[in-house]
Amino acid sequence: MKILDVNVLLYAVNSASTHHVVVKRWLDAALASDETLGVPWVAALGFLRIATNPRAMTTPLTPQQALAFLDALFAYPNVVQIAPGKEHWALLRDLIAKAQTAGNLTTDAHLAALAIEHGAELCSTDGDFSRFKALRWVNPIAKTA
């Protein structure tokens, strides 16, 4: 399973972004695959908050457009909504303690804990995830050799 961070969703819809083409191509390929893609609630809510915010987006989506994007995403048979399970707090606590971080990286630790708990790979363009050593993650815009 791959778990999607909010930045993947935002780049996929934001045609003004320099990362749009690469991330949209990556996401389209992932959606067409047999692999399960997990969308955490925090990523879905973050997408709605940021994609519709004129201070965050040059051309923000309307609420209806943002909801339609998520509806279309959740309609794929290989896309599931991801929520914390019984081990989440222990994993989150351990990640924050080992990385000696919290503050602005608390949500990153939450996403890392979700991915670890679900045996998944986190997909994000955010390099801060490298501080969580137990996490498997991939950056869709990273150059491949």
Tell me what each language-model feature is.
Residues 1-3, 7-39, 54-68, 144-145:
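Short, well-structured N-terminal submotif of metal-dependent ribonuclease cores
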Residues 5, 108, 126:
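Acidic active-site catalytic centers that drive phospho-/nucleotidyl reactions
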Residues 73:
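Ligand-binding beta-strand-loop-alpha-helix segment within the catalytic cores
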Residues 1, 112-145:
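Acidic, PIN/NYN-like endoribonuclease modules and their adjacent C-terminal/linker elements
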Residues 33-34, 76-77, 117-118, 132:
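Structured helix-beta-strand junction loops
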Residues 79-123:
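Active-site neighborhoods of divalent-metal-dependent phosphate/nucleic-acid chemistry enzymes
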Residues 38-41, 125:
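Short beta-strand segments at enzyme active-site cores
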Residues 47:
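Extracytoplasmic
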